[in-house]
């Protein structure tokens, strides 16, 4: 209760960052809707984007803190992704009689991109809850924590792409000019990562049972994607 009172002391009455709304949510009081809700949300997104030095540094610190005493650091995720891709690629290429030289790079890239999607959804469901203390102490736009999350997932995505580059060097699949679509597609991934993380973050902050439900659904959804069922792409 004292934390909430302290928060109220640092949140101005004309706050446009949404910090006051989240403080009320943590206190258990549902935020009151008003005619400026969308304007305040847009203002928060803009102000959060302008605080790029803050969320870039926080995202980088998240990775350093998580793997502080690890020899390989975040590359453990890269290794795990590579092993998973190799196992799934070999298994499903045999089951579905797919060409391994095409299917294995396909599964590898799919797993890497799915890791980004799943990270934005699952971590997004916890983005405000996990940063509750920082939100109460730091008078910054709430979107800073969302940008921080997406930036962190982008860093994971970047070094996981090493696996795919290795697959390209080994199997040399024909990509053609369509391969250039990766860059606009990546931009769409980043934009969608922001709103998805913010959406699930808001819902999970109000309804705490949403986060574990989201975790289960994300794991289930993986097996419903064209990453594994390559035959769907040929239809």
How would you describe each model-predicted region?
Residues 1-233:
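Hydrophobic transmembrane alpha-helices and immediately adjacent juxtamembrane helices
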């Amino acid at each position: 209760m004292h934390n909430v009172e302290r928060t109220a002391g640092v949140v101005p009455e004309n706050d446009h960052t949404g910090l006051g709304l989240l403080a009320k949510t943590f206190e258990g009081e549902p935020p009151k809707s008003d005619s400026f809700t969308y304007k305040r949300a847009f203002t928060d997104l803009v102000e959060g984007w302008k605080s790029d030095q803050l969320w870039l540094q926080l995202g980088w610190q998240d990775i350093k803190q998580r793997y502080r005493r690890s020899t390989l650091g975040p590359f453990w995720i890269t290794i795990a992704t590579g092993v998973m891709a190799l196992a799934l690629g070999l298994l499903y290429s045999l089951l579905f009689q797919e060409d391994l030289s095409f299917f294995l790079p396909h599964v590898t890239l799919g797993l890497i991109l799915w890791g980004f999607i799943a990270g934005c959804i699952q971590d997004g469901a916890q983005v405000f809850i996990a940063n509750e203390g920082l939100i109460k102490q730091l008078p910054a736009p709430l979107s800073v924590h969302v940008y921080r999350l997406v930036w962190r997932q982008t860093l994971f995505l970047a070094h996981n792409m090493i696996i795919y580059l290795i697959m390209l060097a080994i199997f040399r699949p024909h990509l053609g000019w369509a391969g250039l679509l990766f860059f606009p597609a990546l931009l769409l991934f980043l934009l969608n990562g922001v709103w998805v993380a913010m959406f699930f973050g808001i819902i999970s902050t109000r309804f705490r049972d949403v986060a574990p439900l989201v975790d289960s659904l994300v794991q289930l959804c993986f097996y419903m994607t064209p990453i594994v069922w390559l035959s769907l792409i040929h239809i």
